[in-house]
């Protein structure tokens, strides 16, 4: 068994007992990256020297009896999360050479834990996309089948964890950007409640929807990482002051008698038969564990996708107005006057999908159309929130498929934005309502992973992790991606 194939909690045990050093663990992962990265293209930047320095710091912490849960554990950070002194590009030409002067709060918290940062992961440009094909630099491949996408926008982080390039990774989720790639790559991915994890240092896409969360190899690891990154931050005005529990303490609670809601709206048109069957079998596992399965309905979820794309694009058009080439970011070499400089810099710096969403958002916010689009989308948002509140009066969690399909072929949907947007049909409603949700692997369809989404009430991450852990223990998903080869 190679060190790089171990989980966070397995590595933690070995490190704390001093059976291996953080430097040995780090070298194992760096070798793994050299072996598989040319095949999957998950990383924008590899920070080898910094990683080895951090490993020495971790070994000192362990030697001095100061070890924490994540001391010496290697991580990869999505490249829209600020890392001081390390290039943060958002996979865009606009920020190709941007080096932040500060760390995001989540990065600061992880560094205080003693983690080892191995590099930054590829994403759809400015986190806009569902396949990681919109990156200005490279297309990340799915470790299960190199001709397929890993999902998006956090496809680099998901592929890196699936391929054992890191013990865990951070991503961001605006409409499914952690859960959908986790589903397509066969790993665990969690989007916490809006406000639980600080957004300070996350490059904004849609500020009322964005949330940072972890990708891990199992549910226990997810709870450990959430312990480290969750909690109030005065630097983020949307961060919520609540007492933070130890999320690992929920894992082993019995789920007998728990009410699990199944909404027919999450099994509608567009779902692949293989995905539907796999998820239905997964729901049967909960029944066997003594949980009560309850049919529920969330009717307004049907309108979640159009509402999401109006709200997210409107917020993006406002957030991305700051990239004008003056203070930082790409600046055009040839221009006639100030206005031409703005236009040319933005034209050259942004990719097609980003431009599409800026135009969509600007249109939705324009005076003649504000009421017809943006205002109406906000009303739908309220109706969706109310739907979930009513549903949670009858059940404790809601389960269903994370994605309507398994990983699709690279290039299959690039010329059909609507087909691409439909990849998020089961995930966007969770962001619209600000709820927490997790995707865990629940089987294979056509040899590719299928994700089960578990949605909870606001700040009920403990319950979600409990249900996910119970399933993981009962089902034991142990399939591994074969397309990348190597010792596992």
Swiss-Prot record:
EC code(s) of this entry: 6.3.5.7
InterPro entries, sorted: Amidase, Amidase_CS, Amidase_dom, AS_sf, GatA
GO cellular component: glutamyl-tRNA(Gln) amidotransferase complex
Cross-referenced Pfam families: Amidase
Enzyme kind, highest EC tier: ligase
Listed GO biological process terms: translation
Source taxon at top rank: Bacteria
Active site: 78 (charge relay system), 153 (charge relay system), 177 (acyl-ester intermediate)
Reaction(s) catalysed by this chain's protein: L-glutamyl-tRNA(Gln) + L-glutamine + ATP + H2O = L-glutaminyl-tRNA(Gln) + L-glutamate + ADP + phosphate + H(+)
Keyword vocabulary terms for this entry: ATP-binding, Ligase, Nucleotide-binding, Protein biosynthesis
GO MF term list: ATP binding; glutaminyl-tRNA synthase (glutamine-hydrolyzing) activity
Assembly: Heterotrimer of A, B and C subunits.
Function comment: Allows the formation of correctly charged Gln-tRNA(Gln) through the transamidation of misacylated Glu-tRNA(Gln) in organisms which lack glutaminyl-tRNA synthetase. The reaction takes place in the presence of glutamine and ATP through an activated gamma-phospho-Glu-tRNA(Gln).
Family from the record: Belongs to the amidase family. GatA subfamily.
Annotated protein name in UniProt: Glutamyl-tRNA(Gln) amidotransferase subunit A
Species this chain originates from: Caldanaerobacter subterraneus subsp. tengcongensis (strain DSM 15242 / JCM 11007 / NBRC 100824 / MB4) (Thermoanaerobacter tengcongensis)
Gene name tied to this protein: gatA
